[in-house]
Amino acid sequence: MSESEKYRIEVEAIAEFVPGQSDPDENRYVFAYHITLTNTGEVPAQLISRHWVITDGAGKVQEVRGLGVIGEQPMLAPGQQFSYSSGSVLETPVGTMQGSYQMAAEDGHRFDAEIPAFMLAMPRVLH
């Protein structure tokens, strides 16, 4: 068995614009995102920390690092899922988010679960 099969977390992200909290006249665009992590590997693994790279439509980059997600450091058994929602505020109506979760397997091995890039976009802005 290869290491990539033994230690694997799949990350799925869905984002949506939140018009009620946004104010385009003030360059404030609020987005909610919903994340699902699935342990598709063969050993239990705990989410230790996160690293986000958030890029707005003007190319401005913010990096966010911290322990856990929404105050939790969930342990995922093989086949188990963990979902959560959070948000991000941009100064432009479009942007992207990507990054990684730092994981610790039950056997002590540490690895990153990549968060594929996903789009943040106010409806009717992209054609």
Swiss-Prot record:
It comes from the Bacteria. Residues 3-127 form the ApaG domain. It holds the Pfam family DUF525. One of its GO terms (biological process) is error-free translesion synthesis. InterPro entries: ApaG_domain, ApaG_sf, Uncharacterised_ApaG. Coiled coil: none annotated. NCBIfam families: PRK05461.1. This is Protein ApaG. The lineage of its organism: Bacteria, Pseudomonadati, Pseudomonadota, Betaproteobacteria, Rhodocyclales. The gene is apaG.
